[in-house]
């Protein structure tokens, strides 16, 4: 029987996580503001030259070349510099799409055009790929001689919706051939490296900063690369690296001033650089530098709160904390136990700290909406804990819905809007509060991916609130069958997400992109069933080194 004052967390087989190894390193990295200014000036000199390439007049072939250029800009991390030009080009080209694509028989070109138009919300039909299939509906075997074309088709297949059956065939066809290319080593090394990276995570679901860093290395090895474009991409990424390190310094100093490390139980994770990295997955552009610091603070708070709910609080303790958060009254802090009091004080401090900035811009509404989502989040966590430790057995569907809230789906989108300031309006918050199908699908995806990854550890820790566990019980299947079915659900959800991104035409593209970026965050964190947020080695270390430590040579 659980104690009414303290949950026996010491009885859990919970493995203590190491604290972040990166904080001291990034505090010691020097930043030269004069270098940052010099890079910015050179970028401003080159950008008009690229803009000329985008604004040139011409025929259908010219429009086609522009679309291919847009894909290069996306892959190199440069598209945000030219959003207005890209919008105009694609709107004009889509009106003439049949003329532009009609006689085109190059697999790579059609695949790239498909990706670009769908990325920007233009629903180019997947029937454009029928020209590459035989009478049996299968893709022609002769296509396998075109490695870049196959790779482009593989990327395009990840933008499929629930009715794009030809893209299901394309994914099966391309993935098997790309794996054969890796084994056979028949391509040049830089192409094989790109194939390996893409098979791990396609661009559709990878974080933009990683895409840019990897593609710059690939593009430089291409014999026909544009030297001006390559120079701009390198300068841009170097500028991003400088911004990122400055942000980390700001966040790490804030965390150190809190002085909370010695007060936390050993079960709590202090994932400092990791909390910032999760914010980077939501937006990588330099204009959202302040937003990433805001995101890091929220992520730190949410990580501590998650650990307290899962591994420390008794149900009565958590109930009192939830009540206190819902009242949001400073006086209520005196009703809480020690750790609860520290966490609630941290929440108050985070909101006060961020509130000073948004109120100065007349954006206090944004913080109010974020607070409302925090209240919903802590209530959902309480429900999960009651299910995990009590005798209640929710349905699989109920767990996925409530667990999607507890996973911070809605809260993460809200704090990303707060960090964007006036770049998004009230309609963005109202849209998320309406719980549209797109966001509910992402919440379900996150819950499923997290529970697939954590199933073994949840069970060994005695934490029953897991989708795999509930699916096994509800449908009387084995663990392996439950995992397979949940993995299929994730694949189907990705198609629904793609579909909703195309169908949702009343919401600004920047807001929709935040939803897509949350989907990317989930893929980065949980692909290959490897929870990189809680593992300081492996893929997480690779990302940190690639994005922040390895210099990009100008």
Curated annotation (Swiss-Prot):
Pathway stated in the Swiss-Prot or TrEMBL entry: Secondary metabolite biosynthesis; terpenoid biosynthesis
Needed cofactors: Mg(2+); Mn(2+)
Reaction(s) the record says it catalyses: (2E,6E)-farnesyl diphosphate = (Z)-gamma-bisabolene + diphosphate
GO molecular function terms noted in the UniProt entry: (Z)-gamma-bisabolene synthase activity; cyclase activity; magnesium ion binding; terpene synthase activity
Short motif (DDXXD motif): ranges: 306-310
A Pfam match: Terpene_synth_C
Note on cofactor: Binds 3 Mg(2+) or Mn(2+) ions per subunit.
Binding locations of Mg(2+) 1: 306, 310
Annotated residues for binding of Mg(2+) 3: 450, 458
Major localization class: cytoplasm
Protein localization: Cytoplasm
Tissue spec. comment: Predominantly expressed in roots. Expressed in the cortex and the sub-epidermal layers of roots. Also detected in leaf hydathodes and flower stigmata.
EC annotation from Swiss-Prot or TrEMBL: 4.2.3.40
Listed GO CC annotations: cytoplasm
Keyword Magnesium in annotation: yes
UniProt keyword ATP-binding, yes or no: no
Induction behaviour: By wounding.
Family, similarity comment: Belongs to the terpene synthase family. Tpsa subfamily.
Physiological role: Involved in sesquiterpene (C15) biosynthesis. The major product is (Z)-gamma-bisabolene with minor amounts of (E)-nerolidol and alpha-bisabolol.
Protein name, per record: (Z)-gamma-bisabolene synthase 2
Organism annotation: Arabidopsis thaliana
């Amino acid at each position: 029987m659980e104690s009414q004052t303290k949950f026996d967390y010491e009885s859990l087989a919970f493995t203590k996580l190491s604290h972040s190894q990166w904080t001291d390193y990034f505090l010691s990295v020097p930043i030269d503001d004069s270098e940052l200014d010099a890079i910015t000036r050179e970028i401003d000199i080159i950008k008009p030259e690229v803009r000329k390439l985008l604004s040139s007049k011409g025929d259908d072939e010219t429009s086609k070349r522009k679309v291919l250029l847009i894909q290069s800009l996306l892959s190199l991390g440069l598209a945000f510099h030219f959003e207005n030009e890209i919008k105009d080009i694609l709107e004009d080209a889509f009106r003439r799409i049949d003329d532009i694509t009609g006689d085109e028989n190059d697999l790579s070109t059609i695949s790239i055009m498909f990706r670009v138009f769908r990325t920007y919300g233009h629903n180019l039909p997947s029937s454009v790929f029928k020209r590459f299939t035989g009478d049996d509906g299968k893709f022609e075997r002769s296509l396998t001689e075109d490695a870049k074309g196959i790779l482009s088709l593989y990327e395009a297949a990840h933008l499929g919706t629930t009715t794009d059956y030809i893209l299901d065939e394309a994914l099966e066809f391309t993935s098997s051939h790309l794996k054969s290319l890796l084994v056979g080593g028949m391509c040049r090394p830089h192409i094989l490296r790109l194939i390996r990276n893409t098979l791990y995570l396609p661009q559709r679901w990878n974080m933009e900063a990683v895409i840019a860093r990897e593609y710059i290395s690939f593009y430089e090895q291409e014999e026909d690369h544009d030297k001006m474009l390559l120079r701009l991409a390198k300068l841009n990424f170097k500028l991003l690296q400088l911004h990122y390190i400055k942000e980390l310094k700001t966040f790490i100093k804030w965390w150190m001033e809190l002085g909370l490390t010695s007060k936390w139980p050993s079960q709590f994770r202090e994932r400092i650089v990791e909390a910032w990295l999760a914010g980077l997955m939501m937006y990588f552009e330099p204009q959202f530098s302040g937003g990433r610091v805001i995101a890091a603070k929220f992520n730190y708070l949410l990580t501590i709160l998650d650990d307290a709910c899962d591994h420390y609080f008794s149900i009565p303790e958590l109930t009192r904390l939830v009540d206190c958060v819902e009242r949001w009254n400073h006086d209520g802090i005196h009703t809480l136990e020690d750790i609860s009091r520290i966490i609630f004080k941290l929440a108050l401090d985070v909101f006060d700290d961020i509130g000073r900035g948004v109120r100065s811009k007349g954006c206090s509404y944004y913080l109010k909406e974020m607070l409302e989502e925090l209240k919903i989040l802590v209530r959902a966590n309480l429900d999960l804990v009651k299910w995990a430790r009590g005798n209640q057995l929710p349905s699989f569907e109920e767990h996925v819905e409530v667990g999607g809230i507890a996973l911070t789906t809605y809260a993460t989108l809200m704090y990303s809007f707060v960090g964007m300031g006036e770049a998004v309006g009230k309609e963005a918050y109202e849209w998320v509060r309406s719980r549209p199908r797109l966001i509910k699908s992402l919440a379900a995806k996150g819950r499923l991916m997290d529970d697939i990854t954590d199933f073994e550890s949840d069970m060994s820790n005695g934490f029953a609130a897991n989708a795999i566990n509930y699916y096994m019980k509800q449908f009387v299947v084995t663990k392996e069958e439950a995992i397979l079915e949940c993995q299929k659900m994730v694949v189907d959800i990705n198609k629904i997400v793609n579909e909703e991104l195309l169908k949702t035409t009343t919401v600004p593209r920047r807001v929709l992109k935040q939803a897509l970026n949350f989907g990317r965050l989930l893929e980065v964190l949980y692909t290959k069933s490897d929870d990189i947020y809680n593992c300081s080695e492996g893929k997480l270390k690779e990302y940190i080194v690639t994005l922040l430590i390895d210099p990009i040579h100008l």
